[in-house]
Amino acid sequence: MTTTVDIDETLREKLPDLDTFTSLHPHLAGLLASAIGQKLHPQLDEIMDHFGNDQSRARGRSGASATPKEAPATSNLTEDTKKWLRPNGDYYHTRSWGEHDDVMVLREARAGQHFVLLYGAPGCGKTALVEAAYGDELFTVLGSGDTEVSDLVGGYSQLPGGQFVWTDGPLIKAAEAGKPLLIDEIGLIDSKVLSIVYGLMDGRKEYTVTANPERGTVRAKEGFFVIAATNPNAPGVRLSEALLSRFVVQVEMTTDWSLARKLGVPTPAVNAAQNLARKLEAGEVSWAPQMRELLAFRDLEKVFGTKWAVQNLLAASPEMDRPMVANIFSRTYGEPASPAQI
């Protein structure tokens, strides 16, 4: 049965203003029709078309050259979007990992002692996901080429009076407390340093603190878990087979462009970032904006305007990639773009 919905003048007066509808999906009427099996009144289609054209004009373009409709901008998260509070007060919005929620995958992996390796570009959400999964329980080590055993295990420090006192490192603290440990940028740490973690990740579940005989052998309590993150394209990254074999769950993390739009990142900025991501994959550039940069763009644009936000993003890009980045943003926004200067 076909139902016609009539929009009379009274209902028109109750409709939100154009600015409110501008943030909505331009195909909202069609989507509703598909969902409830109704034929909506042509007046509503006309109104929705008008809103879509207004959205194009708000971006300073004609309807014909507006952002493609398959990539609409919206700041409204759906009601079923799950989000988890991170220790810093920000929210992490979950993503699908196959048929599962990514936060729940990490929690189940910890319960089953299936160590996890996340890899992807900086800013794509690796650390945010781990913090969302484990919250205040999490211990973290930020790796580099200068990371030493003492940065993981602990070491002696001298007090003002001259005495030396031993302080446990994050690896020992996490093991004894039965908490998760994130080794961030693990690929930059020397494999000889990382070998100290092996005993706590295999059946032994223990580590002998040779630097402090008084500490002796530390045994991991139930709940101890190791998760690592790395950027495989960073210079100097190396992961031994012995280490990789211990991470039975491995996944590449990428920026969720759809989520970026839902979080209010302007569609032109997302489209430009996607274009750069394709060029990054093709080896034409070494950098593309990820979720972190896009959310910063969103916030800065609200304060300083679009042109300023674009210039700031260009200034954050690697110098060797700036001509390509500037070209893409110039074509996307329809005006010349250059990095910020003072």
Give the role of each language-model region.
Residues 1-342:
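C-terminal regulatory/interaction module of P-loop NTP-utilizing enzymes
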